[in-house]
């Protein structure tokens, strides 16, 4: 799934926070309440949303559910939102280039959904909170203001790590590296056989890589300091070590990486893994479905590993991507929107989503996972692996500052030689400091 397409960022101004609506809602001529759902059509496909909406409509004949699906959702809904025409529910990953969810968070233009957690799931006897896996709410991904209020409901969760071909490793007799020293030794071995150590679909996919590496190098507190723009955090030895490890890894990247790291060609970087031209790439469970029809080397078998540890026996982190559902403050049917969001956690809805490998963070779902992706989720059972959920804290908007872009996208310039690691570190420190000041 192209979570980070290279598209022009949509300028969503602070005026959005002023375009608030009432929960009375729109009604059709026949008296039906209109509920507008906008969902991003990513690697999981579109059919699951159509099926879930149809199932909801069957139980709510008094609601006219209008579903909008798009691979460029921000481009389509943002102009209407700036004109005061809001969808009632949006299902859209955070961390995308257009940064729509993040902009609305900064502008305080999202509806508080804390009460949804205590709603009874439509058609069932239990609450949403009781169905959700422990720890999946209450982090910066769901509670962006670092308080007890939830604004973004966790929709799908997926482990992300270094995806590789288990069959190739078995064929070559290679071991998955446990430390970075082992990783670079393997890189030299693979290079001698004409195989690159590393690639990425687009630079945006390095989010899961960096978050895990930051925690690995500096520990939980250092990771939190980076995410909350602690004073001088990018000047620390730990920060420099993160950038040095990354720069060395990028020196082993496939030569085609940067050229294909865009919205049109990103699957070609993914294909290099299936063709045994590259060993590792950062990705998530959705890649299995996204590349299901792609040709592959004989004996290919999907597998995932956490990042290598800095030292032998060190803790290893698995960045967990949580995609979100949210309600704009300007939505016209907030009550109906919250009911629909609660329905998304029903056994009926979760079953439909799971068939497309869109796994929701509800208790007991691991037992129902398709065999092809079950090993990815089994990584959570490894006692040496820690799940990492969250991301950069929200602040007031700062013109010209995009710390995710500075951290992730600069990888392209490191590979091409257009920037140095010193320039990278300086730019990150400058961006972090500006966001620290904005967060005061």
Residue ranges with predicted function:
Residues 97-159:
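Hinge/lid segment of periplasmic solute-binding proteins
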Residues 58, 83, 252-254, 293-359:
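Extracytoplasmic/periplasmic substrate-recognition and gating elements
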Residues 69-76, 180-185, 259-274:
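Short helix-initiation/N-cap motifs at beta->coil->alpha
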Residues 4-107, 124-126, 176, 296, ...:
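Conserved N-terminal structural module of periplasmic/extracytoplasmic solute-binding proteins
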Residues 190, 228-261:
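Glycine-centered hinge/linker elements that transmit conformational signals in sensory
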Residues 141-155, 160, 184-232, 269, ...:
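Extracytoplasmic/periplasmic solute-binding protein
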Residues 359-364, 377-436:
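C-terminal capping/gating helix-and-loop segments adjacent to ligand/active sites or protein-protein/ligand interfaces
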Residues 112-132, 218-241, 293-296, 309-316, ...:
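Short, solvent-exposed loop/beta-turn-alpha elements that line the ligand-binding surface or hinge
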């Amino acid at each position: 799934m192209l979570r980070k397409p290279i598209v022009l960022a949509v300028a969503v101004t602070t005026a959005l926070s002023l375009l608030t609506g009432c929960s009375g809602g729109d009604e059709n001529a026949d008296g039906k309440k209109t509920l507008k759902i906008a969902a991003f059509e990513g690697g999981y496909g579109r059919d699951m949303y159509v099926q879930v909406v149809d199932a909801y409509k069957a139980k709510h004949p008094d609601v006219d559910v209008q579903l909008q699906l798009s691979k460029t959702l921000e481009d389509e809904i943002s102009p209407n939102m700036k004109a005061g025409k809001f969808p009632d529910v949006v299902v859209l990953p955070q961390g995308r280039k257009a940064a729509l969810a993040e902009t609305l968070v900064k502008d305080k233009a999202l509806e508080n959904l804390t009460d949804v957690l205590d709603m009874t799931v439509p058609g069932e006897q239990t609450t949403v909170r009781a169905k959700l896996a422990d720890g999946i709410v209450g982090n910066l991904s769901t509670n962006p203001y670092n308080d007890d209020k939830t604004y973004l409901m966790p929709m799908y969760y997926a482990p992300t790590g270094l995806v590789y071909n288990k069959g190739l490793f078995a064929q070559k007799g290679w071991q998955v590296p446990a430390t970075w020293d082992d990783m670079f030794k393997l890189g030299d071995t693979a290079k001698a056989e004409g195989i690159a150590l590393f690639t990425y679909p687009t630079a945006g996919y390095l989010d899961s890589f960096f978050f895990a590496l930051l925690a690995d190098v500096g520990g939980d507190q250092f990771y939190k300091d980076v995410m909350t723009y602690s004073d001088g955090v990018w000047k620390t030895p730990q920060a420099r070590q993160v950038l040095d490890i990354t720069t060395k890894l990028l020196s082993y990247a496939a030569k085609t990486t940067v050229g294909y790291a865009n919205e049109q060609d990103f699957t070609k970087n993914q294909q290099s893994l299936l063709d045994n031209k590259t060993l590792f790439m950062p990705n998530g469970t959705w890649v299995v479905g996204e590349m299901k029809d792609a040709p592959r080397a004989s004996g290919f078998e999907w597998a995932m590993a956490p990042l290598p540890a800095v030292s032998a026996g060190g803790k290893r982190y698995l960045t967990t991507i949580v995609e979100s559902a949210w309600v704009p403050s300007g939505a016209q049917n907030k009550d109906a929107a919250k009911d629909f969001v609660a329905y998304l956690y029903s056994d009926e809805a979760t079953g439909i989503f799971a068939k497309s490998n869109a796994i929701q963070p509800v208790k007991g779902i691991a037992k129902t996972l398709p065999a092809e992706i079950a090993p990815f989720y089994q990584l959570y059972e490894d006692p040496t692996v820690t799940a990492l959920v969250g991301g950069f804290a929200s602040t007031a908007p700062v013109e010209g500052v995009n710390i995710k872009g500075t951290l992730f996208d600069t990888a392209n310039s490191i590979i091409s030689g257009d920037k140095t690691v010193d320039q990278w570190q300086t730019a990150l420190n400058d961006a972090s400091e500006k966001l620290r000041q904005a967060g005061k």
